[in-house]
Amino acid sequence: MSELSKALRERAEDSILQLRGAVAEFKNVCYANSLGSESSVLTDLIWGAVPQIEIFSIDTGRLYPETYELMERVQQRYGRTLSIYYPKTEDLEGWVGEHGINGFRNSLEQRRGCCGVRKVEPFRRAISGRSAWVTGIRRGQSASRATASPVEWDAEYGLHKVSPLLEWSENEIWEYIRKKRLPYNSLHDSGFPSIGCAPCTRAVQPGEGERSGRWWWERGDSRECGLHPRRQMGFSK
């Protein structure tokens, strides 16, 4: 990491220590790669220094083409394979048959139901049997994430949640990506600081929050897909 500034190198080394600590303390640690900018950093840290951590992604079936392209570039860069989880066909067919392909726009309940089928259920399968999962959340992303702790008990899923990038700023994320010339989602160059499913993510305007382009038709700052529900944490370290 000689190409990094001293401050950023120390930041990265601290995150690696957190990842190694998670591997030492918990069994079968995994990382949920969302294929955003934070994922570029964490994938590099994990596959470069803590390869025991399995990295997986969820293909909801409605991702941007640029996101699928990134999957390929990441695997080519590191010579490793991402584990990909998909929605269950019968669940997806049932939900679309009842609500329509874009039924998530009808109400908050239906949007959460769509996220549940396309993302949360595959995620539950991915973490089954695990004792900890790694996330790329940062305090600066939203008010609901600002109070998170580096290691928390995730009562929703019954395992620990480790967030080694919690203290990183957006500028630090991008400095790391550029200095190490990491593959990243090209949508970031078009005003997308946060990227999810294509129908539910748009570019943000100057001065808007990092996650304001996610489910923009909904009100409130705590718009989440369900992987990081609020008030789910029992205790923290």
Regions found by a protein language model. Name each.
Residues 1-237:
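Nucleotide-activated chemistry modules centered on ATP-dependent adenylation/adenylyltransferase
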